[in-house]
Amino acid sequence: MSNYDYIEMKVPAKPEYVGVARLTLSGVANRMGFSYESIEDLKVAVSEAITNAVNHAYNDNESGEINIGFGIYEDHIEIMIADRGESFDLEKIKQETGPYHPEEPVEKLREGGFGLFLIEALMDDVKINNQYGVMIMMSKYIAEEEVDMDDDQISTTQ
């Protein structure tokens, strides 16, 4: 599957640019034939990834950029969100935020860390590389039957 189109954007790591990426993704996904529900899932996952970069990658006095890439294939989209800011320990975040139990009162739920779990739940495949900043690669298939062929859920490279 080497024949694909690629769209790349570079935006300042500021909250007001999250919507620019969402609008671009929405247009691309609609053109590809994704359902309304899948487009909403894609927009939420991308918003979470970019918001994480905006909030955590760069210090307050440091300006940074976020690279966003869309690999457009016949049957799926691959999305890359990358920054060159500070990295994080994925296993530590997982331990601090989960697991959650249905009987736990909402008031006692820990804050933060939901973004990565939400991305994982909404996308068909998620890979995180946090060696030089953070790069999140995620993909979603147009037809849900395709997921079974490539259902390797989440992996990390540290």
UniProtKB/Swiss-Prot annotation:
InterPro entries: Anti-sigma-factor_SerPK, HATPase_C_sf, RsbW. Signal peptide: none annotated. One of its GO terms (molecular function) is sigma factor antagonist activity. The keyword Zinc does not apply. It comes from the Bacteria. Negative regulator of sigma-B activity. Phosphorylates and inactivates its specific antagonist protein, RsbV. Upon phosphorylation of RsbV, RsbW is released and binds to sigma-B, thereby blocking its ability to form an RNA polymerase holoenzyme (E-sigma-B). This is Serine-protein kinase RsbW. It comes from Oceanobacillus iheyensis (strain DSM 14371 / CIP 107618 / JCM 11309 / KCTC 3954 / HTE831).
